[in-house]
Curated annotation (Swiss-Prot):
Main location: virion
Intravirion side: 423-442
Entry function: Envelope glycoprotein that binds to host cell entry receptors, promoting the virus entry into host cells. May trigger fusion with host membrane, by recruiting the fusion machinery composed of gB and gH/gL.
Membrane topology value: Single-pass type I membrane protein
Entry keywords, A to Z: Disulfide bond, Glycoprotein, Host-virus interaction, Membrane, Signal, Transmembrane, Transmembrane helix, Viral attachment to host cell, Viral attachment to host entry receptor, Viral envelope protein, Virion, Virus entry into host cell
Span list, region Disordered: 331-364
Cellular compartments annotated: Virion membrane
Chain positions carrying an annotated carbohydrate: 103, 111, 347, 396
Signal peptide interval: 1-19
Family statement drawn from the similarity comment of this UniProt entry: Belongs to the herpesviridae glycoprotein D family.
Residue intervals passing through the bilayer: 406-422
Name this protein carries in UniProt: Envelope glycoprotein D
Length: 442
């Protein structure tokens, strides 16, 4: 609302100009009709030149501007951070950007391919799971895990074949999965590092993540700048190289304390969170609900770090690989997995006659993610857990105090002016009745 009022005042369209002129003229006529017959109380303190200046100020423009300013300050308490983020890129820019990692051509037709299901079937016996935990609010974290991509590329290089690849990040919810980042690569040279390809699709991101997420230098990891608690949960990275898929899961935990520079994220929106059935039917096309952001990796990362520091964040010295979660047997009963019989159960021997059946070995259970996934209500909005109210920062307290002070000062000023004018008019009316004269020259 404040931003709209500011735009209308700085660069108003013709219709708004006409309406403003009529409103200002009407206010001026009503004001001057009340006060024109009475010398204002400040007349003794100003000369005629000052009064001429005051009349220009009272033609409605200054009043309208003051009204906009006061209203904007009062209504900006909850929207100042979002407005600042919306226009910060136009005000400041990083001093320099790193050179591109490689040159490539973007072809839109590669976005027309349906997205394969991120839900893993019983053919996958081993999935790497990493643990990422933020130690404090407003922290920049990284989802990094090494893979066996190099061995696949060496195999392709020995066969002297180019390859195509696709990298997709998902946010796994209890009943669906939301793609948050997707890019396809074509005509790739296996002798070079992964993703150094001649052609690629549009770089697609979930819109709410563009200013707070970017790929790492090798384009395999994901960096999140000041994620909110609603970003906690399970993330899945799917790398597909010539039909072969590599899955990596990241269990992310963000503190519940409020971060003033974080955006709340809703990953459970049914328009983006797709069920296993939708993936299996080939109905998921990321082009329909993800936004384009075709910036090179280095430039995008520079922007994210710049905005993070601009908002008051502290950059980490270095990003480290996420800690691996060790497990002894294949996963079972995990979101995104079909029921898989435990290897231990399969190799179990029958008990000897006369002996009691020993207690069967329990299959390995993945760690529950219920405490990591925010609940969704009927309108699909994130419900934050009940926590102690955060301490109000000094900057917010000062801002609210100034806002209230300006609002009270404006109301008092308007009230005093109206009171003086009405009182002068009343005195003039009494004098007129006493003199029993139709007019009174002043």
């Amino acid at each position: 609302m404040p931003a709209v009022l500011l735009v209308l005042y700085v660069n108003p369209p013709p219709s708004v100009c006409i309406l403003t002129q009529k409103l200002s003229l009407g206010l001026y006529n009503q004001w001057w009709r009340v006060c024109r017959s009475v010398p204002p109380p400040w007349y003794v303190f100003f000369n005629k030149r000052s009064m001429s200046t005051f009349k220009l100020m009272m033609d409605g423009r200054l009043v309208f501007a003051m009204a906009i300013a006061i209203l904007s300050v009062v209504l900006s308490c909850g929207t100042c951070e979002k407005a600042k983020r919306a226009v910060r890129g136009r005000q400041d820019r990083p001093k320099e950007f790193p050179p591109p990692r490689y040159n490539y051509t973007i072809l839109t037709r590669y976005n027309a391919t349906a997205l394969a299901s991120p839900f893993i079937n019983d053919q996958v016996k081993n999935v790497d799971l990493r643990i990422v935990t933020a130690t404090r609010p407003c922290e920049m974290i990284a989802l990094i895990a090494k893979t066996n991509i190099d061995s696949i590329l060496k195999e392709l290089a020995a066969a002297q074949k180019t390859y195509s690849a696709r990298l997709t990040w998902f946010k796994i919810m209890p009943t669906c999965a939301t793609p948050i980042h997707d890019v396809s690569y074509m005509k790739c040279n296996p002798k070079l590092s992964f993703a150094m390809c001649d052609e690629r699709s549009d770089i697609l991101w979930q819109a709410s993540l563009i200013t707070m997420a970017a790929e790492t230098d090798d384009e395999l990891g994901l960096v999140l700048a000041a994620p909110a608690h609603s970003a906690s949960g399970l993330y899945r990275r799917v790398i597909e190289i010539d039909g072969r898929r590599i899955y990596t899961d990241f269990s992310v935990t963000i503190p519940s304390e409020r971060c003033p520079i974080a955006f709340e994220l809703n990953f459970g929106n049914p328009d983006r969170c797709k069920t296993p059935e939708q993936y299996s039917r080939g109905e998921v096309f990321t082009r329909r609900f993800l936004g384009e952001f075709n910036f090179p990796q280095g430039e995008h990362m520079t922007w994210v770090k710049f905005w993070f520091v601009y908002d008051g964040g502290n950059l980490p010295v270095q990003f480290y690989e996420a800690q691996a979660f060790a497990r002894p047997v294949p996963p079972d009963n995990h979101p995104g997995f079909d029921s898989v019989e435990s290897e231990i159960t399969q190799n179990k021997t029958d008990p000897k006659p006369g002996q009691a059946d020993p207690k069967p070995n329990q299959p390995f259970k993945w760690p529950s993610i219920k405490h990591l996934v925010p609940r969704l209500d009927e309108v699909d909005e994130v419900i934050e857990p009940v926590t102690k109210p955060p301490k109000t920062s000094k900057s917010n307290s000062t801002f609210v105090g100034i806002s209230v002070g300006l609002g009270i000062a404006g109301l008092v000023l308007v009230g005093v002016i109206l009171y003086v004018c009405l009182r002068r008019k009343k005195e003039l009316k009494v004098c007129t009745e006493r003199l029993d004269s139709p007019t009174l020259d002043l």
